[in-house]
A protein has these predicted regions:
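Phosphate-binding glycine-rich loop
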Residues: 63-104
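PLP-dependent aminotransferase-like
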Residues: 96-155
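Short glycine-rich anion-binding loops that position phosphate/pyrophosphate groups of nucleotides
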Residues: 32-35, 86-87, 112, 157-161, ...
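Conserved active-site segment immediately N-terminal to the catalytic lysine
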Residues: 196-203
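Short, structured coil segments at secondary-structure junctions
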Residues: 76, 122-123, 178, 203
Length: 203
């Protein structure tokens, strides 16, 4: 069977998920899981959708959902992408936005371990920047990057697995310092202790 794999697969490093205890009841914040069940109205909506609609394709543009999300965050519907979980959205971002011949994607050396997996999968050159001794992202390191060599920057906020967050002022300073570099803020854990940068989109 191995003879059918594409040659580049040999160079890929598999994603290694965080520790997942199999016994006992834990609140797994590292997996972004909630200890609470969905609201009763949500459960009822899921049941209603499952009754007679599962055999149909959903509306391709997810217009109604995008309208609601856009209204909640104060942005435009065309600025909302709906996917099957954040990993799918990340995969599209890596393939569509970060892949530029002769330029690198930059992220912290201690960060979400799926980043190098996607970079390898899509053939994206990478450069990592060390976090500080207290596990912080030094925004000055990113402000000093050369846009002729770097296409894009990505980091979680708060960072994973360190949980240390950047302030909006720091993120805004980076955006102003690097107008020619795409900056992606991965906010998978933003509700645990950081301010969303979505409001900066309109600036």
């Amino acid at each position: 069977m191995n003879k059918f794999w594409s040659p580049f697969v040999d160079s890929l490093e598999p994603y290694v998920p965080g520790e997942q205890p199999r016994e006992g009841e834990f609140i797994k914040l590292n997996s972004n899981e909630s200890p609470f069940s969905a609201a009763p109205a949500v459960i009822e909506a899921i049941k209603a959708a499952a009754d007679g609609a599962l055999q149909l394709y959903p509306e391709a543009e997810s217009s109604e959902l995008r309208d609601v999300v856009a209204d909640y965050y104060g942005i435009k519907p065309e600025q909302v992408f709906v996917g099957n979980g954040s990993d799918e959205a990340l995969g599209h971002a890596f393939n569509a936005l970060f892949k530029h011949e002769g330029k690198k994607l930059v992220y912290p050396d201690l960060s979400y371990s799926f980043y190098p997996v996607y970079a390898g999968l899509y053939g994206i050159e990478i450069e990592t920047i060390p976090v500080t001794e207290d596990f912080r992202i030094n925004i000055d390191d990113y402000c000093a990057l050369d846009s002729t060599e770097i296409s894009s920057i990505i980091f979680p906020n708060p960072n994973a697995p360190t949980s240390v967050a950047l302030t909006l002022d720091e993120i805004e300073r980076l955006l102003k310092a690097q107008p020619d570099i795409l900056v992606a803020i991965d906010e998978a854990y933003v509700d645990f202790g950081a301010d969303t940068a979505i409001k900066l989109i309109q600036d």
